[in-house]
Structure formats: structure tokens, C-alpha cells
Amino acid sequence: MKDIALKTCTLMLIVAMMISLGCKKDRNPVQPSASDSFLPMQVGNLWYTNNQNYTEIKDSLVISGKLYYKFYSLIGGDAVSTSYLRIDEQGKLIASDPKYPDLKVVRADFNGKVGDKFFTTGQGNDTDNEVTITEKTNTQMSFSFDAIYHPNLKGHAYVVSYVKGQGFPGNWTKLKINGVTLK
């Protein structure tokens, strides 16, 4: 009788351990490697030239049910820019703003190919840009922006590039991506 009780107790203990270990939620999910993204997004990422010129991801927030990252930039020591960005399920870089949650601006399409075109807002007004993918390699993507609906800016395109695993190109004195200091 003692043997049966001991075996039953041991079996119950093993089953309880299996259940508790099997139902454990992963509290540290694996983050995508920085090298997998043309714009790695994690709070604390830093692109730094000096104390008057840098961009840092300061926070994350939800806009219209979607997670965005708050990019804070100081330019020339006195100009400030704040952008709220996310990469959607189709690989598009989307900008929005908590003050204007219905605003969605497509800034890049990382799944596109050279020659593909898209519009930033699709509204066909003077703030809408036609974007053309001009370069795509294993390490870099470039996008040409042309304000084709603006009477004075049409035909004066500018290019924005992204480096895989780094995000913004540049000769950074400090570069921190996904918790790893690269420079």
C-alpha cells in the first residue's frame, strides 16, 4: 500500500512540475536581430554625432491601436524634431502622430523592389510625395521623394537611405542599436 501511495504521489508531483513548466509565459521574448531591419526600433536606440546632433528612440506609445516608437532628434543644438514611427506587417515604415491619430504617412516600403513607386499620403495634395525605390541591396535601401503636386517643389527630389542593422546612415560617434553599443 505504501508503494502505491509513494508512486501516486511521485507521479502527481511530476505531472504538476510538467504543467507548471509547460504553461510558463516567456517573459523575455526574443527580439528581432538588429541586422534583420533597415530601421531597428527599440527604446534606447541612439544615433549620435555630438551633444547638438543626435536621434534617439525615447519611448513607445499606442496610436489607433498600433505600437509606435517616439524618435526625438536634436539638430544643430536648437532645432527639435519628434517623429512617431512603426514598421507594419507589410514592411512599410509608417509615421503618425498622437495629436492626429488618423494621419498615416508611408515613409518607406522595405519589401518593395527598385523602381516601385508609392505615395506618402495618397491624398494628391501639395504635401503628398511620390516615392520611388532607387536602391535595394542586402545592406541598404534608398527612397527618392518628389513633391509632384507642389508647384515649386515638383522635380526637386531628395533621397532618404536606410542601412540594414543600423537604420540611419552616418558617421556616428556613438551608435546604440537594440541594447548593443556598436560605436
Identify the meaning behind each predicted range.
Residues 24-183:
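Conserved functional acidic sites
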